[in-house]
C-alpha cells in the first residue's frame, strides 16, 4: 500500500513539475514576444534627436573628477559632445548643441567651483540655441557632464523650456566617477509625462574607447539593428 501511495505521490510531483515548466516556458515566450514587440515599436518611432551640453577643458583630465575634453582628428571636443556624435552616427539622429549665453572658465577646478556656485544659487543660465521642430522627434537623447554631483544648470534650463510629454527621453552622462548621481530621477520629476530611460554612463577616461559599449547599449534597447 505504501508503494502505491509513493507511486501516486511521485506521479503527482512529476505532473506538477511538468505543469510548472510548461507555464514557465509559456511565460518566457510571452515576455520574449512582448519584448520583441516593444523593440519593433521603438524602432518604428520617428526621428532621433541627440541634444548635448559640453564644455571642453584645455588643462587635461583631473584624476578625481575627470575634466571633459578629447582631441580627435586634430579637433578639440568636449567629452559629452564626442559621445553625442557616436550616438548620432549609430542611430542616424540629428545633433543639437545646447549652448548658453554665459561662458564658463576653462581650467577644470575653476569650472567646477563656478558650477557649484551656480547650482547653490539655483540659477538658470539663458540658452542661445533652441529646438524649433521638437514635434518631429519621438526619441530625444540628452547628454551632459556631471558637474558637482548633478547635471549642469543649463540642463535644468533646457528641461524648463520644453515639454517632452509623450516622448522618450534618454539622458546620458560623462563623469569622473559619480555617474548620473540623482540627475535621471530629477529629469523624470521634471518631465512626468515623458518616458525617461537611463542611457549610457561613460567615465571620462573611457570616452575615446566607448564606441563598442555605446553601440551594444543601443542594440539592447532596440534603437539600432544588431
Describe the function of each predicted region:
Residues 69-77, 142-145, 170-176, 201-204:
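Second-shell loop/turn segments in exported
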Residues 6-14:
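Sec-dependent N-terminal signal peptides
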Residues 77, 81, 85, 152, ...:
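Short, surface-exposed alpha-helical segments at coil->helix boundaries
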Residues 14-22:
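Hydrophobic alpha-helical membrane-insertion segments, chiefly the h-region
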Residues 25-137, 219-226:
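N-terminal beta1-alpha1-beta2 submodule of the flavodoxin-like/Rossmannoid cofactor-binding fold
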Residues 195-226:
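Glycine-rich phosphate/pyrophosphate-binding loop and the adjoining helix
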Residues 1-4:
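Positively charged n-region of N-terminal signal peptides that target proteins for export
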Residues 107-192:
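Helix-loop-strand module that forms the ligand-binding subsite of alpha/beta enzymes
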Amino acid at each position: 500500500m505504501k508503494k502505491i501511495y509513493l507511486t501516486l505521490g511521485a506521479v503527482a510531483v512529476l505532473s506538477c513539475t511538468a505543469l510548472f515548466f510548461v507555464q514557465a516556458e509559456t511565460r518566457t515566450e510571452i515576455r520574449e514576444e512582448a519584448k520583441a514587440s516593444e523593440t519593433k515599436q521603438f524602432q518604428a518611432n520617428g526621428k532621433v534627436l541627440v541634444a548635448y551640453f559640453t564644455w571642453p577643458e584645455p588643462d587635461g583630465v583631473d584624476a578625481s573628477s575627470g575634466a571633459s575634453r578629447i582631441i580627435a582628428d586634430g579637433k578639440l571636443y568636449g567629452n559629452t559632445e564626442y559621445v553625442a556624435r557616436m550616438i548620432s552616427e549609430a542611430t542616424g539622429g540629428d545633433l543639437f548643441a545646447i549652448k548658453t549665453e554665459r561662458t564658463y572658465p576653462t581650467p577644470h577646478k575653476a569650472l567646477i567651483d563656478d558650477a557649484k556656485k551656480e547650482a547653490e544659487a539655483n540659477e538658470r543660465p539663458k540658452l542661445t540655441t533652441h529646438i524649433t521642430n521638437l514635434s518631429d522627434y519621438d526619441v530625444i537623447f540628452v547628454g551632459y557632464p556631471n558637474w558637482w554631483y548633478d547635471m549642469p544648470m543649463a540642463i535644468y534650463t533646457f528641461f524648463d523650456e520644453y515639454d517632452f510629454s509623450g516622448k522618450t527621453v534618454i539622458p546620458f552622462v560623462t563623469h569622473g566617477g559619480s555617474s548620473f548621481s540623482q540627475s535621471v530621477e530629477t529629469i523624470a520629476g521634471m518631465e512626468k509625462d515623458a518616458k525617461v530611460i537611463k542611457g549610457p554612463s561613460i567615465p571620462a577616461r573611457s570616452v575615446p574607447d566607448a564606441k563598442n559599449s555605446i553601440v551594444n547599449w543601443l542594440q539592447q534597447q532596440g534603437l539600432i539593428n544588431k
